[in-house]
Design a protein with these regions (language model features):
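N-terminal segments that cap or nucleate solenoid repeat domains
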Residues: 86-144, 490-493, 500-502, 511-520
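All-beta strand scaffolds that present successive hydrophobic residues in beta-strands
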Residues: 102-110, 128-134, 165-170, 189-195, ...
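Short glycine/acidic-rich loop motifs that flank beta-strands on beta-rich extracellular proteins
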Residues: 116-123, 139-148, 176-182, 201-208, ...
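Post-signal-peptide, soluble extracytosolic/periplasmic N-terminal scaffold domains
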Residues: 125-201, 208-217, 221
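Extracellular beta-strand/loop-rich repeat segments of large surface/secreted proteins
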Residues: 405, 409-519
Length: 520
């Protein structure tokens, strides 16, 4: 009897263990199915359906494609995820709606109108569209704008994405979201001359390239009034723009006069932003300004840790390839009505200024800022998002402080009769735990620095003159207080290394407009 009871108890225990195991360990599900609320691993670049926005990743990276792309400066819309589809997962359109689709040489003139949702008035896929003495109107209250307009030209008045558009002596007006004036994409080429372009709504640039498109402009009058609607605009996939003469005005918030994710050369043009920074560049791209008048009026926004006039940065949105952004300005004027002047963060960058007349606001925060950032839109991770910058002034007056931090690298060349008036300040407010960055200042024999406050830098090489505003010599010392050069001024320049000789080998050189000008 005892033996029988023992067998029964053993059987009961085995059944109980089996049930417990079944409750704690559910059976494996087929690949891709959800298991008791625990999602399977997703391929890189995909987002599980129904999931919210996870925390941002450090160093500007997206969390395996699961985060939302950071926004662009001063109100620009978010761009694409790196290497993938545009924000919203929209791909290249397989077809476009248009009033006129051009597949062979065609001429247009007179009044031309488009009122459809997200449609182009003229879409050139092959051949040449010759548009002369035309009055073009594009209006639609239903158009959506957004990424497909910014990246591919959906809804633009004139789109060339396979053929050539030649526009002259015409007027283009759009009042539709995403209603760019003229857009060149891919193999498309646009020539636009002696034409007035006005756009009213968001993501409606004046002249626009993306995806490798090419656009040449001469003597245009362009005005944009929406947000994220630069008068001269480029976006994902880069491209080439050459602009000669004209007036370009952007009136919207987040609408610089020039938005650069392409190779852009501009000559003898008025470039005005009334509610935004003057110029914004992202990633491995280039802008050259020759004898232009550039102005900006950026607003102070809570999401930004400072206010600027020209920015070179990397948002990690995927709108531009990561690499060195190149800003070059020869002659002309630069005016800032609010904030600092030049700002670079979370990227490599090069600035070259050659004899530009600069006007800054009375309370300008800086001439040049090369630091990390704590921007709320996620341009890298604070403490790991500094800049690597080379700045060259040629025959250039530069008034204002130079700010740098230890997670950045700055080589600043003051050359050929240039004059810096300001202090060099080590600002660690966005540097986290700091790093091994540096600031090196090079002053050639024809140049000078007027020091307006105590200054700190890693390396100072000077063959020129350093004084304060009263003409007094300035003390140069090591961090431990060891005096290298005894001065009479109240100010001290603190350095790790000091040299009375300058190596200007890596200073920037200016380009010539003639190398980029196109006659048409």
């Amino acid at each position: 009897m005892k033996k029988l009871l023992s067998l029964i108890l053993t059987a009961i225990m085995l059944v109980s263990c089996t049930l417990c195991y079944a409750e704690e360990t559910p059976p494996a599900k087929p690949d891709g199915e959800m298991v008791q609320g625990t999602p399977p691993e997703m391929p890189i670049g995909e987002m599980p359906e129904g999931m919210g926005t996870p925390p941002e990743k450090p160093d500007g990276e997206m969390g395996n494609g699961m985060g939302m792309p950071p926004e662009k400066p001063d109100g620009e819309m978010p761009g694409n995820m790196p290497g993938g589809m545009p924000g919203g997962m929209q791909g290249v359109p397989t077809e476009y709606d248009s009033v006129y689709t051009v597949t062979e040489d065609t001429e247009f003139s007179g009044e031309l109108e488009s009122t459809g949702k997200d449609e182009n008035l003229i879409h050139v896929t092959s051949g040449t569209a010759q548009i002369s003495d035309a009055v073009i109107t594009r209006e639609s209250a239903d158009s959506t704008g957004g990424d497909t307009s910014s990246f591919y030209g959906v809804g633009a008045a004139v789109l060339a994405n396979g053929g050539t558009a030649v526009i002259e002596n015409s007027t283009i007006s759009t009042d539709a979201a995403g209603g760019a004036g003229v857009f060149a994409y891919g193999d498309g080429i646009a020539y636009v001359s002696d034409t007035t372009i006005t756009t009213e709504q968001n993501t409606a640039g004046g002249i626009h390239v993306a995806g490798g498109g090419t656009l040449y402009a001469k003597n245009l009058n362009v005005t944009t009034n929406g947000e994220s609607a630069a008068a001269i605009r480029s976006d994902r996939g880069s491209g080439t723009m050459v602009v000669d003469g004209g007036v370009y005005t952007s009136n919207g918030v987040g609408s610089p006069a020039v938005y650069v994710t392409a190779d852009i050369s501009i000559h003898d043009a008025d470039l005005n932003a009334t509610g935004s920074e003057a110029l914004c560049m992202e990633g491995l791209n280039t802008v050259r300004l020759f004898d232009c008048d550039l102005s900006g009026a950026m607003q102070d926004l809570d999401q930004n840790d400072n206010t600027w006039t020209v920015i070179v940065y990397q948002s990690m949105s995927g709108d531009s390839e990561i690499g060195k952004g190149h800003f070059e300005m020869t002659g002309g004027t630069l005016e800032s009505t609010n904030g600092g002047l030049f700002y670079t963060t979370n990227t490599e960058s090069e600035f070259i200024l050659n004899n530009v007349s600069i006007t800054v606001c009375e309370d300008s925060e800086y001439f040049l800022r090369v630091t990390g950032n704590a921007n709320q839109r996620g341009w890298g991770s604070t403490g790991n998002n500094g800049a690597d910058c080379t700045f060259t002034g040629i025959a250039q007056l530069m008034e204002g402080d130079v700010q740098w931090d230890s997670i950045s690298a700055l080589d600043m060349y003051i050359a050929d009769g240039s004059h810096l008036v300001g202090a060099v300040i080590n600002d660690e407010s966005c540097a986290g735990n700091g790093g091994d960055g540096y600031c090196s200042l090079y002053i050639d024999e024809d140049s000078s620095w007027t020091v307006t406050g105590d200054s700190w830098m890693t390396n100072l090489s000077c063959e020129g003159i350093i004084t304060d505003v009263d003409g007094k010599s300035v003390t140069i010392a090591n961090a431990d207080g060891t005096v290298i050069v005894q001065g009479e001024s109240e100010y001290t320049i603190t350095v790790d290394n000091y040299s009375e000789t300058c190596d200007m080998t890596n200073a920037g050189n200016v380009s010539a407009w003639e190398n980029y000008a196109v006659e048409f």
